[in-house]
Amino acid sequence: MAIRIKLKPGREKSLERRHPWVFSNAIHNIKGKPEAGETVDVVAHDGHWLGRGAWSPESQIQVRIWTFDREEEIDREFFARRLQRAQIGRNDLIREQGLTGYRLVAAESDGLPGITIDRYANVLVCQLLSTGADLWRDTLVELLAEQYPDCAIYERSDVDSRKKEGLLPVTGLLHGTLPEMPVIIEENGIKIAVDVIKGHKTGFYLDQRDNRAIAARFVKDKSVLNCFCYTGTFGLYAAKAGAASIENVDVSSLALATARLNMQVNGLSDDNVHYNEADVFKLLRLYRDEGKTFDVIVLDPPKFADNKAQLNGACRGYKDINMIALQLLNPGGVLLTFSCSGLMPADLFQKIVADAALDAKREIQFIERLSQASDHPIGSAFPEGFYLKGLVARAW
């Protein structure tokens, strides 16, 4: 008989709307003794069945729902179906944009909580972020090896969120032979070098693909300041689009070295590109004091808030950096600014940038709202999947 998790009265509403998380404070009792990652059934307080998911005893999210179909068993065939569905959902995008790098599985938004899989040419990179995902590792590797026989499979489960599940970090080759790093992927006709072993996240920020192309519309014959540039891909797009000058800024010398490589891989001269290993906050203040200005500024900072307690501080950080950036823009200049903090609502982020403009004594117009690329879908019952927010603002 299946292990059963009974919820407290009234706590079934989110599951009835197909949200895939059950928090520890929603649980009334447990029938059985589930092991970490084991499949459990979740029922309402009156006993009616709600969903079937993975047990995470050390997490605040104690059950992540695999399925809301009572007839669907969680077995090898289940994961095969979900992986195939995820690939089908990307096929049109791959054909349209000629992608060789894309997100294959976007965790909860693809019905596979805790499982992220990115494809970089012939390398699949997996992040397994929950006990349920961890338990099914071998099955996932077998299925991926069958469905993608030409691909190596590498694990990058080295993120802090695993600690909340009571899991240790795991990295390493799971299947096949890893090619020499970096791997070269292609998007929108541009080649990008990706190091899946040492790079951020799974190696690269695939979610900004569409926004890189949008940024390129504003840069011809313009001066561009690319902040928190990582491997310089906003600057790379700008170079190909005819920017007059580009400054790529990051604290990582390794990232900047890859930014140089990206220019070379695309056969582009970097005579008009400056690579600046610096703290962005300090550099922007210095440039303001020196009276330096730019036509286009990209702000793509790391996550400022990992939890609700950090949100107020994140708001102050976003306001400060956007205020200084706006002070550095020439009249008619364009700011592309982003937040990758899932806890930051899009409307609040826009208000922060508007308030920053007031403090900077600049009039701005919001031209576009931006989000993550379409291979990072947002499940209709999982608003948390909408994490990347961006704005394009013109300053006067």
Swiss-Prot record:
Molecular-function GO term, any one: rRNA (cytosine) methyltransferase activity
Localization (cell): Cytoplasm
Domain PUA: 2-79
EC code(s) of this entry: 2.1.1.191
Enzyme class: transferase
GO cellular component terms given for this protein: cytoplasm
Reaction(s) the record says it catalyses: cytidine(1962) in 23S rRNA + S-adenosyl-L-methionine = 5-methylcytidine(1962) in 23S rRNA + S-adenosyl-L-homocysteine + H(+)
Pfam family, one: Methyltrans_SAM
Keyword terms: Cytoplasm, Methyltransferase, RNA-binding, rRNA processing, S-adenosyl-L-methionine, Transferase
Role played: Specifically methylates the cytosine at position 1962 (m5C1962) of 23S rRNA.
Family per record: Belongs to the methyltransferase superfamily. RlmI family.
Name this protein carries in UniProt: Ribosomal RNA large subunit methyltransferase I
Gene source species: Shewanella baltica (strain OS155 / ATCC BAA-1091)
Lineage: Bacteria, Pseudomonadati, Pseudomonadota, Gammaproteobacteria, Alteromonadales
